[in-house]
């Protein structure tokens, strides 16, 4: 029997010589450099999904603070944590303050991730599914939900998905307790007030 990863129990709340708030970008990226912690977090976010393995571009660890740029004169992006799971790529971001730009920002991130993964000469069908996930320490849409998930659908035909393989997700750490289960509640609790340790 494969041991279940539990991100909320195995990742957070440990103390050492240097305690740093987990919402710190660099600290979050450092924690996510461990494969078991990445898997644990994904299985906490996607309850019921079994993640057997994840693959990093360097073969060793996720790309923390991944930098993507195409033309010197155009805007570049820096992703907090970027990694792959089979035919899916993930970008996970921590956002402490509401700057009012998340919808357009996620559009930019998703588009540049697509352009970065599709080499010249490859077919569009070779694009991997993608998730851009923002863990927000505020309610980005002020609806009280703990999770907001967006996919492309047709406005004229109800229930008709575009099927482009793109998903944008916002996790609201101030959302309703119990909505996403006890593991996610524990994770949100650590994000809101917990620390992780290095050293």
State where each predicted segment sits.
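Elongated, amphipathic alpha-helical interaction scaffolds
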Residues: 1-199
């Amino acid at each position: 029997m494969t041991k279940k990863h539990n991100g909320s129990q195995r990742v957070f709340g440990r103390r050492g010589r240097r305690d740093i708030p987990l919402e710190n970008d660099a600290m979050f990226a450092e924690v996510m450099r461990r494969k078991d912690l990445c898997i644990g977090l994904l299985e906490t976010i996607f309850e019921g999904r079994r993640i057997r393995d994840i693959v990093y571009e360097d073969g060793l660890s996720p790309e923390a603070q991944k930098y993507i740029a195409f033309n010197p004169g155009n805007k570049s992006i820096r992703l907090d944590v970027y990694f792959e799971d089979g035919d899916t790529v993930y970008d996970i971001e921590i956002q402490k303050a509401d700057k009012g730009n998340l919808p357009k920002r996620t559009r930019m991130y998703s588009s540049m991730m697509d352009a970065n993964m599709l080499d010249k000469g490859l077919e569009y069908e070779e694009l991997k599914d993608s998730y851009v996930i923002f863990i927000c320490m505020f309610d980005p849409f002020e609806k009280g939900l703990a999770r907001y998930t967006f996919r492309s659908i047709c406005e004229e035909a109800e229930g008709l998905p575009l099927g482009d393989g793109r998903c944008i997700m916002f996790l609201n750490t101030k959302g309703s307790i119990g909505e996403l289960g006890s593991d996610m509640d524990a994770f949100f609790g650590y994000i809101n007030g917990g620390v992780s340790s290095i050293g």
